[in-house]
Amino acid sequence: MELALFSTSLTMGPRPYMPNPSGFGVKEYPLPPGTNITQMHMVHRHGSRYPTSSASVATFPDRVAELLGNGTRFTGDLAFLNSWEYQLGKEELTALGRQQLFDSGVLNWFNYGRLYDPSSPLIARTTTQVRMLQSAENFLNGFFGPNWTKNVTLKVLTEETGFKNPLAGDKACPNNDNDRSAAGDWASTQWQERYLKSATDRFRQSMTGNPNWTIEDTYNAQTMCPY
């Protein structure tokens, strides 16, 4: 990528969401003569959210507090960390995320609302994770309006090991949490050791006392940027 065209916000991985300028690779064509849409089934991802409780973003404040407790003091551009307070939420949708799902509901009503038959029971499904439940509720609010509970039954599926839940495949796959599925994590750690070495050295130059600042700390600090 040419430096003149470089955008930090486009190089942060999955967050924040940036639409593909060339679309999804699926071309839109009109329906063939004599055909019509009679049903619409949708699987929708949750909206923009705050970090999960176990994410490096959420654990970074505790690490800063640990360093300060061990006598480390931050200087220069990092001096703000001496009195910094973490103010992000955890797990739930951001205000933007709620708006995204509401807007999606409105758009889908205009596109497919004519298919809705009030005499036919309609069921929507989500899971017990806060952001999932909030996403479903905001989508249905956009689709049907504030009285959406009169139009659709929202089934909330338990997202825990041992429960049948097609919306949470990780709970049904025995390999999800073992080393067999962790190759990506290993590769990421190896890459961090390379590309963050110089940055870690620069961070240490802005610390006094007992700065046991690691490459992992630099990475965790970096993960806060999208938020």
Which ranges hold each PLM region?
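Signature for phosphate-centric chemistry
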Residues: 1-121, 130-227
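Structured beta-strand/turn binding interfaces of compact recognition modules in eukaryotic regulators
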Residues: 127
